[in-house]
Every structure is written in structure tokens, then in C-alpha cells.
Amino acid sequence: MYLLQISISLLLLISTAATALPLSTPLIPLLDTLINITITASTLNSAPPTALTTTTHSLECADVNQGALVCCPSIVDGDQPVVVMAAKMFGFVLNGNSVNGVGCRTIYNGAYCPVLEHRLCCQVTDLMVLPLVSLAMWCHRAEEL
């Protein structure tokens, strides 16, 4: 009986010691994730280069990003090769999560945009004149108005 009490006491002592480890180990990945989310959120909202920012502001985009209203048949993320190349040509880095339009054309307030195309408010539209690309950058969906 005495041996059983010692075994139970020893088991309780070991089991409480095993669960009493500091919680700092799982806390480190959580803090790392929170820091990365904060950094990502801050870069998503960074402004485009002043030299390339559109001067043609649309009333429909005034509350979104002060951009121009465009209609684009395709959209691509900022990490796609065509977008990365265009950004590098003009000496800036674009966030990989940004929305960018390809094959875009300017539309004016209340103008029609075909159902299968994307209505975007874009802050950089100077690259829309490029012959093969017609790229609009730093965009937000106009539906978010």
C-alpha cells in the first residue's frame, strides 16, 4: 500500500511538472504572425509614386482612393511578372497583394462597363497607354464604393 501511495504521489508530481512549462514557446509564433499581419497591412495601404499618380480623378472614386475610374477585362495581383516588370521599369516596388488592371480603358462617371469586365478605381493610369499591356495599378474595386 505504501508503495502505491509513493507511485501515485510521484505520478502527480511528474504530471504537474509536465504541464507547468512556460507558455512562451507557443507565444512566439503568435507574436510573429501578428507582426507580419501589421507589416502587410501597412504596405497594402502605402501610396503609389507621386510622379505616376493620376491627375484624372473620378467622382465615383473620390471616397475610395482618389483614382480614375477604369474598365478592365482582366485583373492581376502585384506579384505577377508583367506587373513586377512594369513596376521595376519605373523604379518602385508594388505590393504582391495589390489589384492591377490589364487591358484597361478610362470610363467616365456613370459610363457603361461590360458585365464581364472589372470596374476599378486606379491611382496609376499612365501605363494604360503602353501598346501591349495597358496596365492600371494601385486599384480598388469600384463596387466597394
UniProtKB/Swiss-Prot annotation:
Knockout mutant characteristics: Does not seem to affect germination and growth, formation of sclerotia, ability to penetrate and infect host tissue, nor spore and mycelium surface properties.
Tree of life domain: Eukaryota
Cystine pairings recorded for this chain: C61-C121, C71-C113, C72-C104, C122-C139
Parts forming coiled coils: none
Signal peptide feature range: 1-20
Glycosylation sites: N36
Key words, A-Z: Cell wall, Disulfide bond, Glycoprotein, Secreted, Signal
Subcellular location: Secreted; Secreted, Cell wall
Job description of the protein: Aerial growth, conidiation, and dispersal of filamentous fungi in the environment rely upon a capability of their secreting small amphipathic proteins called hydrophobins (HPBs) with low sequence identity. Class I can self-assemble into an outermost layer of rodlet bundles on aerial cell surfaces, conferring cellular hydrophobicity that supports fungal growth, development and dispersal; whereas Class II form highly ordered films at water-air interfaces through intermolecular interactions but contribute nothing to the rodlet structure.
Name assigned to this protein: Hydrophobin-like protein 1
Native species: Botryotinia fuckeliana (strain B05.10) (Noble rot fungus)
Organism lineage: Eukaryota, Fungi, Dikarya, Ascomycota, Pezizomycotina
